[in-house]
Curated annotation (Swiss-Prot):
It is found in: Cell membrane. GO terms for molecular function: metalloendopeptidase activity; zinc ion binding. The keyword Zinc-finger does not apply. One of its GO terms (cellular component) is plasma membrane. The gene is htpX. It comes from Wigglesworthia glossinidia brevipalpis. The active site is at 140. Belongs to the peptidase M48B family. Its EC number is 3.4.24.-. This is Protease HtpX. Binds 1 zinc ion per subunit. The chain crosses the membrane at residues 4-24, 33-53, 147-167, 197-217.
Length: 294
C-alpha cells in the first residue's frame, strides 16, 4: 500500500503548490472552459511529476541501497531471480534495491516498464523461503509488466482534474454567495481573495480524500491481477504460501507514499480506504483462479 499513498500525497502536494502559485501570480480562468483546461493541465501535471520522480522518492523514503554489483549469495540470488522473471514477463530487468526493515515486504515503481525499480526488505530476505520470496518478486514483476504505474498515473490525473475543477467552482460559488458586491458575481475577480484561496485549498484536501476511494478501488483490483500474474510465473501454491506468511507478520514500516505498490498494505477502519484487498480475499481469488488467464 506504501506506493499508492505516497503517490496520492505527492499528487496532493503538487496540486496545493500549483494552487498557491496561481493565487500569488494572480492567474485566473476567465471562463469555465479555461478552468477545465487549467484543471487538466495541473491535474495531470501533478500525476506525471509523481510518476517521473517515483524511483527517486521511493529509494530515499526507505533509504534503499541499489544493487549494481551483487556482493554475496543473497544479492546474487535476488539479482538472478528478478532477471529471469523479467525475461519471462518480456520486460527489461528493473533496478534492484534492498532496504532495512523488519517487515516482510517489497514494492515496484518507476515511470515505465523498462525503467522500473523493485525494492525488497531485509525482513523478506531473512524470513521467507526462496519459493515464497520468488512469488513476492513475481508479484512485483507483474505490477511492472501490467503497466500498473502508468494506469494509476492516468487514473490519478483524471481524479486530480475533477478535484481541482470542483474545488474552484464551489469556492467561487461560496465566496460570491457571501459577497457584498453582487455586480461581480459572474466574474472571476473573487479568485484574488484570501477567502477564495483558503476555501479552495480546504476543498482540495477534502475532495482529494474522497477521490482517494476511487484510486484505492483501482489499486485493489490491480493487486488481484498482480497476484494472478505471480501465480502464472511461479505457481499459485507458492503465491498462496507467500500471502499466508505475510498475513502473520507485522504491517509494512514504510512511508505512506509507497504503500500501494507493496506486496502487503496496512489495515484501515474500512476496506474502501485500503490500497490492498484483505489477504484472505486474495488467497480465495487465487484458489478460484478468478483473475488468472483462462
Amino acid at each position: 500500500m506504501m506506493r499508492i499513498l505516497l503517490f496520492i500525497l505527492t499528487n496532493l502536494s503538487v496540486m496545493i503548490i500549483f494552487g498557491i502559485i496561481l493565487f500569488i501570480t494572480g492567474i485566473k480562468s476567465s471562463s469555465s472552459f479555461g478552468l477545465i483546461i487549467m484543471s487538466g493541465v495541473f491535474g495531470f501535471g501533478g500525476s506525471i511529476i509523481s510518476l517521473l520522480l517515483s524511483k527517486y522518492i521511493a529509494i530515499n523514503s526507505v533509504n534503499a541501497k541499489i544493487i549494481k554489483n551483487p556482493k554475496n549469495d543473497i544479492e546474487n540470488w535476488l539479482f538472478n531471480t528478478i532477471k529471469l522473471q523479467s525475461q519471462k514477463a518480456n520486460i527489461g530487468t528493473p533496478d534492484i534495491a534492498i532496504y532495512d526493515a523488519e517487515d516482510i515486504n517489497a514494492f515496484a515503481t518507476g515511470p515505465k516498464k523498462n525503467s522500473a525499480l523493485i525494492a525488497v526488505s531485509t525482513g523478506l530476505l531473512n524470513n521467507m523461503s526462496k519459493k515464497e520470496a520468488e512469488a513476492v518478486l513475481a508479484h512485483e514483476i507483474s505490477h511492472i509488466s501490467n503497466g500498473d504505474m502508468i494506469t494509476m498515473t492516468l487514473i490519478q490525473g483524471v481524479v486530480n482534474t475533477f478535484v481541482i475543477f470542483l474545488s474552484r467552482v464551489i469556492s467561487k460559488f461560496i465566496v460570491n454567495l457571501f459577497s457584498t458586491n453582487k455586480e461581480d458575481e459572474n466574474s472571476y475577480e473573487s479568485e484574488n481573495s484570501w477567502s477564495y484561496f483558503f476555501i479552495s485549498m480546504a476543498l482540495e484536501v477534502v475532495f482529494g480524500i474522497l477521490a482517494s476511494i476511487i484510486t484505492f478501488w483501482f489499486s485493489r483490483k490491480r493487486e488481484f491481477y498482480a497476484d494472478a500474474g505471480s501465480a502464472e510465473i511461479v505457481g499459485k501454491n507458492n503465491m498462496i504460501a507467500a500471502l499466508q506468511k505475510i498475513k502473520n507478520t507485522c504491517e509494512p514500516n514504510v512511508g505512506k507514499e509507497l504503500l500501494a505498490f507493496c506486496i502487503n498494505g496496512k489495515k484501515s477502519f474500512n476496506e474502501i480506504f485500503m490500497s490492498h484487498p484483505p489477504i484472505d480475499k486474495r488467497i480465495q481469488a487465487l484458489i478460484q483462479e478468478k483473475y488468472m488467464k483462462k
